[in-house]
UniProtKB/Swiss-Prot annotation:
This is Histidine decarboxylase. It catalyses: L-histidine + H(+) = histamine + CO2. The keyword Repeat does not apply. Gene3D superfamilies: Type I PLP-dependent aspartate aminotransferase-like (Major domain). The modification N6-(pyridoxal phosphate)lysine is found at residue 234. It comes from Pseudomonas fluorescens.
Length: 405
């Protein structure tokens, strides 16, 4: 490949931009402290995990199925399902994983309705359109968790006997976890048997947090889920967006399609799949021991609590959900939100303490600006109130402005 001087200059400019902003991220859940230099040499190959997975190979030779199998073995254990009872693959990201879970639910219950909270990731709107699933948005509790009463009220009103439940294991804006045990208990109380509904878990961020904490909320197959997806570029960290999805093998069998010229069965959403991301996930998972993952997660959680404490000590109403690295606080000015690349929604903003925040310098800088702005706004409000009070206490003017000017 030969590039013109102008094109080389453009690339160099982008390189400098990336180097400058490599660790900028405080508002979005993407870990930046990764090093895949050992894998650079593989970029000269067209590695394509075509149709197959680590469970079944295709006849395309340059694949990374062996590594993908190791990755899926790791996640089967992480999410408490026997490898022989599980099926999964490395996806392009959380949206594909969620689509796969909803696809399985729809194939199991073609006339079922998908129920999800209003705090669910925006991709669910695309998914229901693409899969043409009936759907109902459910109210959320103040912390972002699904409103269980509203969920059951809607299921009852719809007379839905085969609900497909989209549970959040860490919502996008508030890091809230829907309690999948409570959901199952409420469905049982409503007379809906376990085999009559499907339960998918979107654990894009928290799927790599909960397994490593001392007191996790329910999140695994042992807790009753039918499928789960996790993003690879969030807590793990990757230069290429990716993720994984794990499901029960018996539910996946119904979507299998044999492709003779590839000599494989297709069960994935996409056909050709990135063969480099399984290598990256494999390298990342092999690079840290269980104890090291626990340390990374604890550091992130401790940093999140530090941010909450600093905000609250300065009178800012900040908070986080249990076992969440998402810190929610009142939305600051557009200037601050833009400067720190904050995600904002309505009156709230958040910061996310992913592992690349080795110290609190960026968090401190953000909090200092938010606090200073809040104090200035308070001062202005007091001054405006005082001036208004003075005006109201002045005696009414008894002269005509036109004649006395």
């Amino acid at each position: 490949m030969t590039l013109s001087p102008a094109d080389q200059s453009k690339l160099e400019g982008f390189w400098q931009h990336c180097v400058t902003h490599q660790y900028f991220n405080i508002g979005y859940p993407e870990s930046a402290d990764f090093d895949y230099s050992q894998l650079h040499r593989f970029l000269q190959f067209s590695i394509n995990n075509l149709l197959g997975t680590g469970n079944e190979y295709s006849n395309y030779l340059l694949n990374s199925f062996d590594f993908e199998k190791d990755v899926m073995t790791y996640f089967a254990e992480l999410f408490n399902i026997a490898l022989e009872d599980s099926w999964g693959y490395v996806t392009n990201g959380g949206t594909e994983g969620n689509m796969f879970g909803c696809y399985l639910g729809r194939e199991l219950f073609p006339d079922g309705t998908l129920y999800y909270s209003k705090d669910t990731h925006y991709s669910v709107a695309k998914i229901v359109k693409l899969l043409r699933i009936k759907c109902r948005a459910v109210e959320s509790l103040p912390n972002g968790e699904i409103d269980y009463d509203d969920l059951m009220a809607k299921i009852t009103a719809d007379q839905e006997r085969h609900p497909i439940i989209f549970a959040n294991i860490g919502t996008t804006m508030r890091g809230a976890l829907d309690n999948i045990v409570t959901i199952q208990q409420r469905l049982q109380q409503a007379g809906i048997a376990r085999h009559d509904y499907y339960l998918h878990a979107d654990a894009a961020l928290s799927g790599m947090i909960l397994p490593f904490v001392d007191h996790p909320q329910p999140f695994s197959f042992a807790d009753g889920i039918d499928s789960i997806c996790v993003s690879g570029h969030k807590m793990i960290g990757s230069p290429i967006p990716c993720g994984i999805v794990v499901a029960k093998r018996n539910n996946v069998a119904r979507i299998s399609v044999e492709v003779d010229y590839i000599r494989a069965h297709d069960k994935t959403i996409s056909g050709s799949r990135n063969g480099h991301t399984p290598l990256m996930m494999w390298a990342a998972l092999r690079s840290y021991s269980w104890a090291e993952w626990r340390h990374r997660i604890k550091h992130s959680l401790d940093t999140a609590q530090y941010a909450v404490d600093r905000f609250q000590a300065s009178g800012i109403d900040a908070w986080r959900n249990e076992n969440s690295i998402t810190v929610v606080f009142p939305c600051p000015s557009e200037r601050i939100a833009t400067k720190y690349c904050l995600a904002t929604s309505g009156n709230s903003a958040h910061l996310i303490t992913t592992p690349h925040h080795h110290d609190c310098s960026m968090i401190d800088a953000l909090i200092d600006e938010v606090v200073a702005e809040a104090q200035l706004n308070t001062l202005r409000s007091k001054r405006a109130f005082t001036e208004q009070t003075v005006v109201e206490r002045l005696p009414a003017a008894s002269f005509n402005l036109r004649t006395h000017y």
